[in-house]
Amino acid sequence: MSDTEYLTRAEAVLAAVERTVDAANDGDHDIDLERNGSVLTLTFENGSKIIVNLQPPMKEVWIAAKAGGFHYRYVDGAWRDTRTGTEFFAALSEYATQQAGLPITFTA
């Protein structure tokens, strides 16, 4: 994948996360979302955080959550965990639901 393709796909991930948080905040959630360049910080009511950031040199998207740190690479049409193959949005949904204490589903 070229650098341009990576940036287009990775920025789409950040935009999808932002859209989901905005929609969740219209419902029962209270998630603070801060973007600083290519880093998104989601802060939940209990003070816990999830950080999603882009890693252009490695062409990856990373998640840092209470569950740990996870690296995702674009493979066969989806961002997949480099160790387990878990899809990015499914994993982020699980981590955010755990930390928020309420269900939240992230999609592309």
UniProtKB/Swiss-Prot annotation:
GO terms for cellular component: cytosol. Keywords: Iron, Metal-binding. The keyword Transmembrane does not apply. The keyword Ribonucleoprotein does not apply. GO terms for molecular function: ferric iron binding; ferrous iron binding. One of its GO terms (biological process) is iron-sulfur cluster assembly. It comes from the Bacteria. Gene3D superfamilies: Frataxin/CyaY. Involved in iron-sulfur (Fe-S) cluster assembly. May act as a regulator of Fe-S biogenesis. Belongs to the frataxin family. NCBIfam families: FeS_CyaY. This is Iron-sulfur cluster assembly protein CyaY. It comes from Burkholderia multivorans (strain ATCC 17616 / 249).
